[in-house]
């Protein structure tokens, strides 16, 4: 296959095009999801221990795997702002992901125009920009996976294993590379690199050891995750079963976030690459570009199958837009490769195919842009309530706050032990009120959710009605996407009276 060299000015241009919106977003856009504020808290805690020299290996243990938090904590030693350190690190990984998509596409297609189109598709994607500016693991994890794929295409199996291992210390789903990369190498070269295999085994062994050192149970993290999963289904029984509206909603979210054209091209490329007459990687006379496309297809469908299986077995009860980001990143080189193959096989329809793909990509980007704006509106409403709590709650007091809006709780910066949720309190009216009094609950964050006890017992609170028990202190809402939050001061004196 022909290999192209890049003009000297190309890389700086690509870095600027991908970097400007992501670095700016890190400073000016809010985090796209409430989990980001938990990451920020963990980054701050870890950074403080690193600065004071009290950091221990067991401090890596937590609900999530620790690599992203650790990298951000090291950066925060110099930046000294945990909020922006996590966002800045994610933005850098987002820039790197864009550059890797360009490099992988160029390697697959030997066509710079196709590579630049693929780069533009990810560099200007609203969802990718939004999450590159958020302190979360989705984009850093995608970077490590893309880097691993790049070295697989180069047959650099040890380096591919190194980046796959880094992905495996970022998110647990990348542990499947223990099987995926050796399988690809065996099918390609009829051998397996023992060094690469040993490197791939490091993430699970490392995490089991950390869990054992921190808790005495090498599976403690998975026990904790299963407990959270069971609690989530208990609090939201609708998530434990499929309904047509929920399946349609989740399917639409996954399809749009992955990109319709990308998803279709992945299935087309899989059919091209694995049809019967090209059944083995090593078949004599098989064109190199047909061999090479198989690795990206295997990567794509490994993660796609894992996500779909988790959803169908209720291990992943709902689909969020960010779940499609990795598939989108892996699928762009496949899309460009498929476009070129279809154009070669049917030149008369090449223009029609290109226009159709562009139309689908523009449609997807438009939907994602609208969704990102709505998500930012929701975050602004949540931030207003969180800021009020942060300013008015005395951290030295022994009172509690009731909140079924977890994002508000995390955003407030108040220790999570100060918050109570519906899962902590009795569900009957008398028991609920007695518990408020017993725990000295000072504030109640009211959201009209089906699983929220206050929403069921006191429906009048959704309109800001003042009662003997609850006095409204602020209201924050967004019209698109809908978010409506009332903050009430609890009158414990009235609660105490029969």
Regions found by a protein language model. Name each.
Residues 1-2, 153-157, 176-204, 208-209, ...:
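Perimembrane helix-loop-helix junctions
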Residues 11-16, 162, 178-179, 197-205, ...:
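Signature aromatic-anchored transmembrane alpha helix within multi-pass, membrane-resident enzymes
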Residues 16, 182, 252-297, 301-304:
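Hydrophobic, aromatic-rich transmembrane alpha-helices
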Residues 20-21, 25-28, 191-269, 300-307:
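Membrane-lumen/periplasm interface segments of specific transmembrane helices
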Residues 25-37, 48-73, 77-78, 84-87:
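Membrane-proximal lumenal/periplasmic loop motifs of glycosylation machinery
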Residues 33, 127-138:
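Short acidic/glycine- and proline-prone juxtamembrane loop motifs at membrane-interface regions
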Residues 132, 138, 167, 176, ...:
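Hydrophobic/aromatic-rich transmembrane helices and adjacent perimembrane loops
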Residues 356-409, 419-424, 430, 436-437, ...:
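Membrane-embedded, lumen/periplasm-facing catalytic core of multi-pass transferases
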């Amino acid at each position: 296959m022909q290999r192209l060299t890049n003009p000297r000015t190309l890389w700086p241009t690509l870095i600027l095009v991908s970097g400007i919106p992501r670095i700016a977003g890190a400073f000016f856009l809010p985090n796209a999801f409430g989990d980001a504020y938990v990451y920020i808290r963990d980054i701050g805690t870890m950074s403080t221990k690193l600065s004071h020299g009290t950091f221990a290996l067991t401090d890596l243990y937590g609900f999530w795997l620790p690599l992203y938090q650790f990298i951000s904590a090291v950066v925060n030693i110099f930046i000294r702002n945990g909020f922006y350190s996590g966002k800045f690190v994610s933005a850098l990984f987002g820039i790197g992901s864009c550059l890797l998509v360009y490099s992988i596409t160029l390697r697959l297609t030997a066509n710079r125009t196709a590579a630049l189109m693929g780069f533009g598709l990810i560099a200007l994607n609203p969802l990718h920009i939004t999450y590159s500016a958020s302190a979360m693991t989705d984009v850093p994890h995608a970077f490590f996976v893309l880097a691993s794929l790049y070295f697989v295409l180069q047959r650099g199996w040890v380096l591919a294993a190194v980046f796959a291992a880094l992905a495996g210390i970022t998110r647990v789903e990348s542990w499947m590379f223990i099987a995926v990369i050796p399988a690809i190498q065996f099918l390609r070269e009829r051998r397996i690199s023992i060094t690469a295999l040993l490197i791939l085994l490091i993430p699970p062994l490392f995490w089991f050891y950390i869990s054992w050192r921190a808790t005495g149970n090498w599976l403690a993290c998975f026990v904790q995750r299963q407990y959270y999963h069971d609690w989530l289904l208990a609090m939201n029984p609708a998530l434990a079963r499929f309904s047509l509206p929920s399946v349609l909603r989740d399917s639409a979210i996954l399809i749009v976030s992955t990109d319709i054209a990308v998803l279709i091209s992945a299935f087309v490329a899989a059919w091209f690459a694995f049809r019967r007459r090209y059944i083995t990687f090593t078949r004599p006379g098989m064109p190199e570009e047909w061999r090479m496309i198989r690795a990206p297809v295997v990567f794509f469908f490994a993660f796609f199958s894992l996500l779909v299986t988790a959803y169908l077995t209720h291990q992943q009860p709902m689909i969020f837009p960010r779940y499609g980001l990795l598939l989108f990143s892996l699928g762009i080189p496949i899309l460009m490769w498929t476009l070129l193959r279809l154009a070669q096989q049917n030149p008369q329809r090449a223009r029609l195919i290109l226009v159709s793909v562009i139309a689908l990509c523009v449609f997807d980007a438009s939907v994602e842009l609208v969704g990102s704006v709505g998500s930012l509106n929701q975050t602004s409403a949540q931030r207003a309530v969180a800021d009020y709590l942060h300013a008015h709650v005395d951290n030295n007091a022994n009172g509690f706050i009731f909140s079924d809006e977890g994002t508000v709780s995390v955003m407030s910066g108040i220790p999570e032990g100060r918050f109570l949720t519906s899962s902590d309190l009795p569900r009957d009216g008398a028991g609920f009120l007695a518990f408020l009094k017993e725990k000295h609950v000072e504030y109640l964050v009211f959201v009209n959710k089906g699983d929220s006890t206050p929403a069921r017992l006191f429906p009048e609170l959704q309109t800001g009605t003042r009662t003997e028990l609850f006095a409204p202190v602020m209201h924050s809402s967004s019209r698109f996407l809908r978010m409506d939050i009332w903050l009430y001061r609890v009158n414990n004196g009235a609660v105490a009276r029969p």
